[in-house]
Amino acid sequence: MYNSADVTWTLVAAFLVFFMQAGFALCEAGLTRAKNTGNILMKNMMDFCIGTPCYWLVGFGIMFAGSGALIGGFDPFIQGSYDFGTLPVWVYAVFQTVFCATAATIVSGSMAERTKFSAYCCYSAAISLIVYPISGHWIWGGGWLAQLGFHDFAGSTAVHFVGGVTACLGAWMLGPRIGKYSKDGKARAIPGHNLTAMALGVFILWFCWFGFNGGSTVSMTGDDTMVSAGLICFNTNLAAALATVAALIVCWVRYGKPDVSLTFNGALAGLVAITAGCDVVDPFGAAVIGIVAGVLCIFSVEFFDNIAKIDDPVGAVSVHCMNGLWGTLAVGLFATDGGLFYGGGFAKLGIQLLGVVSVAAWVLVTMTIIFTIIKKTIGLRVSEKEELDGLDIHEHGLASAYAGFAINDATYAELDVNENTDLGEDDIAKASPEKVAAAVKVTQEAPLPAELDSGMHKVSIIVQLAKFESLKQALNKIGVTGMTVTQVMGCGIQKGSGEKYRGAEVDATLLPKVKVEVVVSKIPVEKIIDTATKALYTGHIGDGKIFVYNVAKVVKVRTGEQDYAALQDVE
């Protein structure tokens, strides 16, 4: 007999969990660069839209169509007979579908800004088809871990640890983003472009987590269930709040100022950690779980950034993998019935540890195979040029996710806002053509028809003030002796200002500049470009910009000479 209160409660919770996709999309987009925003949004849309039919096809059956120790059963399109108590099968199916999508979307953040969109679609399908359903069966479908007494109420392991382990493996196999590490291995900051979007995403996720955890009772019938739902929601909120405070304090002590993005990461860490045991711990246990989660999150980000050298743009590994692990083990410590700190001994803690180790092994083996197949076939990572230009334009044909907004300096040279500048190679002889092009951008006006081409060109070079002398000497060596030099605006953050982002030093992106202009006819333009590029290159985005224009006519005012004759004593 179905119960309307239980059905309504579960459906509303499912709707809230679905809305977590919006939170993940905003959080990830805000913590990455503007040139990849469209790609981030597409990934968060498509992992849900691909995962939904995949889970309907076989995932749900693998998870719930039977009580085998390792796997449920094969039930394509959910055609079998199921008993979910007071819930119709389709209510339970939609609730589980949105949980499956959450596991898949976690991976997006750690592999952001350098993953092929086609590859992302493929491994999102694999997660929903087989990886998540099998480990989910072990935990929630009557599998061997459930039979041992493993407890994961709403998914610290089943959802977040699965997604977090996959995220860690994927980020490691991809390698870091260009410019993330200097030649000596020091981590560099690559700031996100919109902390407002990130903050809104975290608030949405926090709000939806009440459905994620509270809705996992899948019932609102009876006094005991209602009391449990209230405790679950209270514990969820308390752990998140204290995790945020703990993260803030650690940041303040370690960096001298409270880091915005890491503090918000701390909130998510607390939410992930309390998810496993929110129904079996008291508020005091929830408080400790949250505090540890916030501290763990900060040190975990530092570890993966500086020691493991795994580039995780949004902190997904620290939030979901490490705190999914901590939250699951915390059940064995703080469960009021059987927890180590409540007189229960080590038995429950041992079962919890066995569970996370087993799930980690399953995910690592299967996802290593899947990532390797993708890498050997369609490829896992985009090219250097695509990464430097941004995935929006190359993967989606999107010039900008912010149409109508552009930021230029006084020389009309485009600036990448909050852009890490280090390309990782300061020797131009060893740098790839893509890195050279990113450091010294060249823009040439389309050539004129032969009958209109005077053979003369104006070359305008935007150069950092410190590089002007070396540029002048290099141009003199190839015969350029006449030039116009103009100082232009472009002063910004200077070295030594102490600015940090997620604990890493932020590069100065704007420095004093000069504009050097020369008009040439007998010296080939290509030679000017090559000489200037070699003189300016230091291995950083923004080393210089070169603009080449066609010149229709030149007149020397003093003598009246025109065109080629007017240039003879100035080249």
Which positions does each model-derived feature cover?
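Glycine- and aromatic-enriched membrane alpha-helices
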Residues: 1-447
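Positively charged, small/polar-rich N-terminal and surface patches that mediate targeting and assembly
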Residues: 394-400, 414-571
